[in-house]
From Swiss-Prot:
The keyword Coiled coil belongs to this UniProt entry's keyword annotation: no
Catalytic activity: a quinone + NADH + 5 H(+)(in) = a quinol + NAD(+) + 4 H(+)(out)
InterPro entries according to UniProt: NADH_DH_suC (IPR010218), NADH_quin_OxRdtase_su_C/D-like (IPR037232), NADH_UbQ_OxRdtase_30kDa_su (IPR001268), NADH_UbQ_OxRdtase_CS (IPR020396)
Subunit structure: NDH-1 is composed of 14 different subunits. Subunits NuoB, C, D, E, F, and G constitute the peripheral sector of the complex.
GO cellular component, one term: plasma membrane
Gene3D superfamilies reported for this sequence: NADH:ubiquinone oxidoreductase, 30kDa subunit
Lineage of origin: Bacteria, Pseudomonadati, Pseudomonadota, Gammaproteobacteria, Thiotrichales
GO molecular function terms attached to this record: NADH dehydrogenase (ubiquinone) activity; NADH:ubiquinone reductase (non-electrogenic) activity; quinone binding
Major enzyme class: translocase
Protein name: NADH-quinone oxidoreductase subunit C
Length: 214
């Protein structure tokens, strides 16, 4: 580990000492985890002001709904029975606390350091965090994309609309319980002279399963 990286880590840890934040250095990268999502805006504002993180390079999220679940149960019996291909997807779609994690990538050009700041969203019923578009204008569209793909709402965002999917789109495509086939398909109808939407007729099947070996 470089001494410069450790020095940056120690200084930032001191700045955030009054908050519920845990930090680590792993694979040459600094990561801080915020315990309370209500502190996100205040902490990021403090980092921008006191350690000159003038650039927000990305905002994204992760859905941990199926984390640790295997499509195929791998055991000794597999060698005798083989695998069952084309299995139907079976997601547990009930609200799960800590299901979503929001991630911010920050860059300080003045200090020549990048950090990752992330926070698990505790309440699965109210998926809401404060927007940081007032701190970094680049957050505007990035937060719109996170809302579009994951359904995470950003409080005080100036224009929280979908940015990638079509008008009237139902659902959020990067959620783990969103079917890979989608819900509707579109085609051009020559008789009507316009694009029409129809229910998907493709079976949602797992042909390339995720296997977790312990």
């Amino acid at each position: 580990m470089s001494t410069k990286l450790q020095d940056h880590f120690d200084k930032i840890t001191k700045i955030l000492s009054g908050f519920g934040v845990e930090g680590c250095i792993s694979y040459g990268e600094i990561t801080f985890s915020i315990r309370d999502q209500r502190d996100i805006h205040l902490i990021l504002k403090k980092l921008k002001k006191e350690y000159l993180f003038e650039q927000l390079t990305d905002v994204t999220a992760v859905d941990y709904l199926t984390y640790g679940q295997s499509d195929w149960q791998v055991g000794k019996v597999v060698s005798q029975t083989g695998f069952s291909r084309g299995r139907q997807q079976d997601f547990k779609t009930a609200a799960v606390d800590n299901r979503f994690e929001i991630i911010y990538q920050l860059l300080s050009m003045a200090n020549n350091v990048r950090i990752r700041v992330k926070c698990k969203l505790k309440d699965a019923q109210i998926i809401l965090v404060d927007s940081v578009s007032d701190l970094w204008p680049s957050a505007n569209w990035a937060e719109r994309e996170v809302y579009d793909m994951f359904g995470i709402y950003f409080n005080n965002h100036p224009d929280l609309r979908r940015v990638l999917t079509d008008y009237g789109f139902v659902g959020h495509p990067l959620r783990k319980d969103f079917p890979q086939t989608g819900y509707v398909e579109m085609r051009y109808d020559e008789n009507l002279g316009r694009v029409v939407y129809e229910p998907v007729e493709i079976d949602d099947r797992v042909n390339t399963p995720r296997v977790i070996r312990n």
